[in-house]
């Protein structure tokens, strides 16, 4: 049996920016002294004149990105989720969300999976914060394949997008035939007894949980909701039945 390939979604983020950068000269990347960790350093190496390190000043970085977008550029502003959504929330809200500017925020090291980085860096509030901003699209891809497509979808979307990536390498369960769409859920596994809804790295965990439940005679359905906003309520309701938990 072949070993499951594992890749961190932040790796996909950086590599896809380079891919897009080759086709779209208006794409620029901003960082806050974390290019090596957020994996945007590969973009800096390929396009040094289109990468801007704003230093440890995330709030200012968001305002710079906002200004760039008004001049026709498509900025991807990147930092850890704790800083992109937490420290810079006011600037994201007022300078990007309120005027509905075409800025993409790439937030890495999200959730508690950053482990040894400590509680101060374990951002679990970013979903709530970013969803509260009118017009902000919020996406949390589950694996390398979905992350690459999500970055491309964010570029093609006219408006603010918050992309959430993890630090850890996670199993790649999508194949090249998978097509990501903003606002659309995905039925990963069919099941008739219980439904498990997840996103990000928890989708792979949900798949493994479904296997464990199967050993106990429980047929679990797994749904991936990568788009947190706008969420696919239609997709979720389609799987509601009196028999399902």
Regions found by a protein language model. Give the residues of each.
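Short, conserved beta-strand edge motifs with alternating hydrophobic and charged residues
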Residues: 30, 164, 197-199, 221-225
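Single conserved hydrophobic/aromatic residue that forms the stacking wall/gate
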Residues: 235-245
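Adenylate-forming
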Residues: 29, 213, 234-235
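Secondary-structure transition/capping motifs at alpha-helix termini
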Residues: 49-50, 214-219
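Glycine-/acidic-rich phosphate or pyrophosphate-binding loops and their flanking alpha/beta elements
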Residues: 8-20, 42-44, 149-160, 169-215
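Conserved strand-to-helix beginnings and helix N-cap segments that scaffold or border functional pockets
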Residues: 89-90, 206-207, 233
């Amino acid at each position: 049996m072949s070993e499951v390939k594992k890749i961190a979604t932040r790796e996909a983020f950086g590599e896809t920016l380079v891919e897009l950068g080759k086709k779209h000269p208006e794409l620029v990347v901003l960082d806050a002294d974390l290019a090596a960790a957020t994996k945007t350093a590969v973009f800096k190496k390929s396009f040094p004149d289109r990468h801007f390190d704003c230093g440890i000043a995330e709030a200012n970085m968001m305002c710079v990105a906002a200004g760039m977008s008004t001049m026709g550029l498509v900025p991807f502003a990147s930092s850890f989720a704790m800083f992109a959504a937490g420290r810079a929330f006011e600037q994201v809200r007022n300078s990007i969300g309120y005027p509905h500017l075409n800025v993409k925020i790439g937030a890495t090291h999200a959730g508690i999976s950053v482990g040894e980085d400590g509680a101060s860096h374990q951002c679990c509030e970013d979903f709530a914060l970013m969803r509260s901003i009118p017009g902000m699209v919020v996406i949390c891809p589950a694996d390398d394949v979905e992350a690459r497509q999500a970055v491309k979808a964010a570029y093609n979307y006219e408006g603010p997008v918050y992309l959430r990536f993890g630090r850890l390498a996670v199993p790649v369960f999508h194949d090249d035939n998978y097509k990501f769409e903003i606002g659309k859920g995905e039925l990963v596994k069919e099941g008739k007894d219980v439904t498990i809804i997840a996103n990000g790295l928890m989708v792979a965990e949900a798949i493994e949980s479904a296997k464990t439940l199967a050993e106990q005679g429980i047929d679990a359905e797994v749904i991936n909701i990568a788009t947190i906003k706008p969420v696919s309520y239609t997709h979720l309701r389609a799987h509601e039945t009196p028999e399902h938990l």
